[in-house]
Every structure is written in structure tokens, then in C-alpha cells.
Amino acid sequence: ATSNSIFSFGAPQTSTATATGSGIIISDDGYILTNNHVVDTSSSNSSYSYYDISDATSVKVKLNSGTYGDDATYDAKIVGKDSQTDLAVLKIDKTGLTAAEFGDSDQAVVGEFVMAVGSPLGLDTTVTQGIISAVNREVESDGTKYVCIQTDAAINSGNSGGALVNSEGKVIGINTLKLSGSGVEGIGFAIPINSTLDVTSQLIDHNKVIRPYIGISGINLDDSTAKKYNLVVGVYVKTVQNFSPAEKSGLQLGDVIIKADDKDITTMDELNNIKNSHKVGDTMKLKINRKGEEKELTVTLEETP
């Protein structure tokens, strides 16, 4: 049943280059979830390499021929894309499709049996098997951090955007990255499906992801760094953007943010995670240390410009 909801697509990058990938049908009327990139590790020496789907001059979707026939190829529209989460939603003019069933990726456990479904190297609806090697694995690619499911199921060029499914055939992840290089085998990463739900909904509704922002840059202060500069542990405010929510709240250069919504913070990642749990228009409480004196500020979050 799962393979009925899998497709492959070709996205010509220039007049002489074509990239391919995989994806998942998420509605019976033609919405398809994939990555914001098309994996092509053979074209780069980087462990992670891809082309941005927005560079494509056209995108075509080929549905599972066993279900929809040999000529089931359609032009696709890019509904929305988000480079921060490496997700994109496509739309084809087709109804009566079989949508994939989602599992609960929060329940994924190490050692659990999984299958990677996609079109590696253009080999349509290929299935490889393995286990979940790790959960909540933090991976950085091109400056962006992802929290992923790690698997040893074979993931190759063209698998990107395809489904990682559990033993019930339910999608628990979007195959996204692999480590490659001499002596490296069986290290692939999938975006947990639960983390895609809100992004997918926003891409369909707004053609983009609407995120709140504060408007600062900061420096992480751990114990040793804080002691060295006679500061407290937290996030040192390095810059405050003009007319930003941070400036409007009274936050200043040199402040050290020590709590956000009553939670201790020591890194910008922690601050951003709390911020991202809010919606535009929400308020966020900050406790700061300013020249040895603690103060509380309230930031009203605005849409990222």
C-alpha cells in the first residue's frame, strides 16, 4: 500500500542537467511532500550535496506505474518550499490518488525495523530495509541543523524526499541526507514525519512558512566563557536589529538572556527553540542580566521579514 503513494520526479536544472528525487503523496487530490532539494551526491565531493528545487525550470512527477499505469507522468507545480526544514510541497492535476498513511515518529525506537522507499539512481519504487540506528540525531548540512532519525537502510542519490516507513507501512520519516565517503556505510538520515506536519500545512495554506522572530544575534556563554568575561551564563546579546521585536521590548546590546518563558537558556539554539514554539503575535517572557542587575522583559513576536 505504501508504494502506491510514492513517486519520482525529474527537475531539470539547466539545459544540460537533470536531477531526480522521490516524494510522498499526502492527499488524494495531488499534493506531494518532498525535500526542498534533489540529491545528487555524484556531482560533488561534499558529504551532503543537492540542488535547490527552486532552480528547476520544470518539475515532472512520475507516479507508481504498477498502480497508475506506465504513462502516469504529470507536470508539477511548486506550491511552497522551505529551505530551513528542507521541505517542499508539489501539486499535480490528478485526483483519486492513494495518500500515504503517517505514523507517529515520536514513538520511533532504536532497533525498530524500517524500510526506505524511493527511486535511487532512477530505479523506480525501490525498497531497502534496515533498522533505526538512532533517534533525535542532530546533523548539520550547509549551516542548517536538522534533528533526524538515523537509519542503516540504504539511501542513495534519488532517495531524497522518499518515505522511511515502519513495519506497518506507515511513514515515519522523509529520507533526506546520507553520509558518504571512503569507509562510510549505512549512515542515512530522515526528517521525522511529526516535525513536517505544521510546515506542510503552512506551505499548502500560505505557500511559505510563517515564523516568529525576535531580531537579535547572540553569543553562547557557558561557565568558562562567562567567568572569563565576568558575565553570567546565558546568551550574550551581540546585536539588536532596528525596529525589531527585541528593540521594541527594550532589549539592549550587552544584555545576557538567562531565561525565556521561565526556562533556563545557555545557547541561541535553546532560545530559538522556545521562540519557534510560539506563533506570530504571541508574547515571550525574557529574564535578562544587565550589568549585574536582573530584569524581565516581554517580547511580542512578529513575522520574520
Where are these regions (language model features)?
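Short beta-strand/loop motifs in extracellular/secreted proteins, especially
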Residues: 57-59, 255-256, 284
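Serine-dependent protease modules
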Residues: 1-227, 232-233, 241-242, 268-279, ...
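Short, conserved beta-strand segments of beta-strand-rich sandwich/propeller modules, principally
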Residues: 283-285, 296
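Conserved PDZ fold ligand-binding element
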Residues: 31-36, 246-268
